[in-house]
């Protein structure tokens, strides 16, 4: 069956339209164990966010966060560590993201191969629409502010971190890649290095053929919980609309769709969506983004996001911002764990500051 542009943009990674996203994503290949790798420790936290309090979807302000502490953390009590924040994709939470990238095994393997030890932090942004797109919205809550503000402050207060931008990294895959590009561009002063893994939604996504019948189906929903029965692509439409075109005057969904009930595009809503595309707002933050110590992008050659990823790389270079791009053999999810162990963590190991 044909893979649609929507599926690629939302970062499903599904090879068949309608296939379960989580099912597709756990097919990530497993790297072999690295001989002699010391054990890391994983802590599961609940971090309260004032930025997410009071959102109209009722998404809990207590957010699941996983922290991977390096092998030496308990032993070297005076040592401080850089921190890398890793953002998950659409339809999954941080727990499934951990499984996809095979943490803590891939971190242990990277450290055993010579990557300097660091702390990894994986927050969850999953909600009733399967993802908040790491944006600020009265409907979803202010996830951008939470990730770039409250979460950093919490981790720096509770762990032995090197609490400065030069020792802080941001990475994400798919929707998380969108989040990393969005936050990494808009809040560049908070981070020292940025890595985008097959980032979705770098270009304006448009209405993508949303029909009058589909709009009628969505507008007939009587609760946000009813969205759980929707097909994948329609649920993804609600996720985007709740993040990018929230409307507190339109219960129960509290959003505006980019197409009206007659099937016509709504230019004022599409303009809001386009304004949230990193390729649309990059130019406004060039002076901040230029200060990164390093920026890298990667994507599989069989991934529908190849061209969008390439466009972001080219846009950075056009502004005189150094970045690297690797298009590797693979699809949207096939090599995530290998990439994390052998490329992503070594990238941060060589680009972040490890000195006090």
Where does each model-flagged region fall?
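Bacterial N-terminal signal peptides that target proteins for export
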Residues: 1-10
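N-terminal targeting/docking segments
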Residues: 2-3, 20-22
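Bacterial N-terminal signal peptides
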Residues: 10-18
């Amino acid at each position: 069956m044909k893979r649609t542009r929507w599926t690629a943009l939302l970062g499903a990674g599904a090879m068949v339209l309608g296939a379960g996203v989580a099912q597709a994503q756990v097919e990530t290949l497993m790297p072999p164990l690295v001989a002699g790798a010391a054990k890391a420790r994983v802590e599961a936290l609940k971090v309260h966010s004032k930025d997410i309090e009071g959102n109209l979807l009722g998404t809990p302000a207590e957010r699941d966060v996983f922290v991977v502490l390096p092998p030496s953390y308990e032993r070297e009590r005076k040592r401080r560590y850089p921190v890398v924040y890793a953002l998950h994709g659409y339809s999954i939470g941080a727990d499934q993201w951990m499984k996809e990238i095979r943490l803590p095994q891939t971190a242990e393997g990277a450290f055993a191969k010579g990557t300097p030890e660091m702390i990894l932090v994986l927050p969850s942004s999953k909600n009733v629409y399967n993802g908040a797109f790491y944006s600020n919205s009265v409907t979803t809550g202010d996830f951008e502010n939470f990730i770039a503000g409250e979460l950093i402050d919490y981790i720096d207060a509770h762990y032995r971190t090197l609490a400065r931008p030069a020792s802080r990294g941001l990475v994400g895959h798919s929707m998380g890649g969108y989040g990393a590009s969005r936050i990494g561009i808009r809040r560049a002063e908070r981070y020292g290095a940025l890595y985008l893994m097959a980032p979705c939604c770098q270009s304006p996504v448009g209405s993508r053929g949303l029909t009058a019948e589909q709009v009628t189906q969505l507008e007939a929903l009587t609760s946000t919980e009813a969205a759980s029965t929707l097909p994948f692509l329609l649920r993804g439409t609600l996720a985007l609309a709740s993040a990018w075109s929230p409307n507190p005057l339109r219960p129960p969904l509290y959003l505006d769709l980019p197409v009206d009930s007659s099937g016509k595009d709504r230019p004022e809503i599409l303009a809001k969506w386009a304004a949230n595309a990193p390729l649309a707002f990059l130019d406004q933050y060039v002076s901040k983004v230029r200060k990164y110590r390093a920026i890298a992008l990667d994507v599989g050659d069989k991934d529908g996001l190849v061209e969008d990823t390439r466009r972001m790389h080219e846009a950075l270079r056009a502004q005189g911002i150094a970045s690297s791009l690797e298009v590797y053999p693979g699809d949207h999810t096939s090599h995530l764990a290998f990439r994390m162990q052998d490329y992503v963590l070594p990238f941060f190991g060589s680009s972040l500051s490890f000195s006090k």
